[in-house]
Every structure is written in structure tokens, then in C-alpha cells.
């Protein structure tokens, strides 16, 4: 809150544990050609559902041609380890929907460390604000192979503030990667839904 203006609001449901946006190191437990999907053991009783379109090319078998029309059994194998993020919570008898395209949300940006084609500025940002942010983004230093999206909270922020948030997210991704390399699947890596901890980290880092 700044004066009478609310700039940021974080809400967390305390009645049940949410796993949406959590990141895990999982293992392909079953490949289903008929569904064009795989099931992933990521540490819970009901295995997660990973559609073909949510599998990053970094996990494709050696020799696979990304340009050709591949079948899922030609891309991945049972027992293969993958880093996944929960896109949708478990519902009824259905397991959680997973993706290997990771998104890390900061205060002003969303970092997509393995999706260079994604990125840009939130659709809710229009007019002069959009133009100014586009200019600010030109000065950002982002590793190749990664993408970012500017959130609505980024309106009015310059290159320096956006770069600060980007650096924070890059360090977070590095930490997640290092933890993944040390651990065997299934293994929990990161929980985004801890609102208090995430908000406190951002506030402290920006003082």
C-alpha cells in the first residue's frame, strides 16, 4: 500500500495445502501413446499428467528431430527424470496437470528459464505504459534460452528495478537447478504458494 493506493495483494488459502506452481523433480512412470501424454511420479499418491505439448525439447531423446511430427513414445521414456511444475491442482480422481515449461513469478517479472519463445508484456498493460516498459526491457540482461513477461506491477518501473527482479529470479532458478542435480526423483524442489516468505524476501531485497 502506498498512501491510499493498493499496489500489490497476495492471498493464500490456509484451509488446504495448494500445490499449484510448485516445482518437483519427477520420474516418468508411464507413457500413454493413445493420450499423447505421460504420467509422472512427483512424490504424491496420484501421479501427475504431462501432455506432449508441455514437454520441453531439452527432454527429447537424442536423435529426435523437433521439426518432425513426433509421437510421445519417440520423445521420452519411462524412468526418465524431468523437472515439472504443477499447472492445475488434482481434481476428483484426476492427477495434477504438469508442465516442464517452468515459470517463476517475481514482483515485477515472470521468468521462463526454458522457454525463450515466450515473453513480452502483460496484455493488461496498454498505451504509454506499454511503450515505456518496452523501452525499459531493451536494457535488460537476460541469458539466452530464457524468456520474461512483465507483470502489471512492473508499470512505472525502470530498467534497474526490472533487472533487480530478474537477477533475483535467475538466482532462484540456479538454486532450484542445483537442488535438482543433487536429488533423486521424486523430490520436492520449490513452493511458490508460501506468500509470507515470498513477499518478505522481495521486500527485504528491495530495501
Kindly give the residue locations of the regions a language model identified.
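Single-stranded RNA-binding surfaces
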Residues: 1-204
Amino acid at each position: 500500500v502506498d498512501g491510499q493506493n493498493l499496489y500489490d495483494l497476495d492471498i493464500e488459502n490456509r484451509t488446504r495445502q495448494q500445490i499449484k506452481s510448485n516445482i518437483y523433480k519427477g520420474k516418468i512412470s508411464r507413457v500413454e501413446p493413445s493420450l499423447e501424454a505421460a504420467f509422472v511420479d512427483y512424490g504424491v499418491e496420484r501421479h501427475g499428467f504431462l501432455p506432449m505439448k508441455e514437454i520441453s525439447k531439452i527432454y527429447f531423446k537424442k536423435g529426435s528431430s523437433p521439426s518432425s511430427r513426433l509421437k510421445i513414445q519417440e520423445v521420452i521414456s519411462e524412468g526418465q527424470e524431468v523437472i515439472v511444475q504443477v499447472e492445475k491442482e488434482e481434481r476428483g480422481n484426476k492427477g495434477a496437470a504438469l508442465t516442464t515449461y517452468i515459470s517463476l513469478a517475481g514482483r515485477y517479472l515472470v521468468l521462463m528459464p526454458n522457454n525463450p519463445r515466450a515473453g513480452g508484456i502483460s496484455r493488461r498493460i496498454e498505451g504509454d505504459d506499454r511503450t515505456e516498459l518496452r523501452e525499459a526491457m531493451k536494457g535488460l540482461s537476460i541469458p539466452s534460452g530464457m524468456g520474461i513477461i512483465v507483470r502489471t506491477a512492473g508499470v512505472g518501473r525502470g530498467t534497474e528495478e526490472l533487472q533487480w527482479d530478474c537477477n533475483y529470479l535467475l538466482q532462484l532458478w540456479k538454486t532450484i537447478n542445483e537442488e535438482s542435480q543433487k536429488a533423486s526423483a521424486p523430490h520436492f524442489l520449490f513452493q511458490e504458494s508460501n506468500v509470507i516468505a515470498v513477499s518478505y524476501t522481495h521486500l527485504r531485497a528491495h530495501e
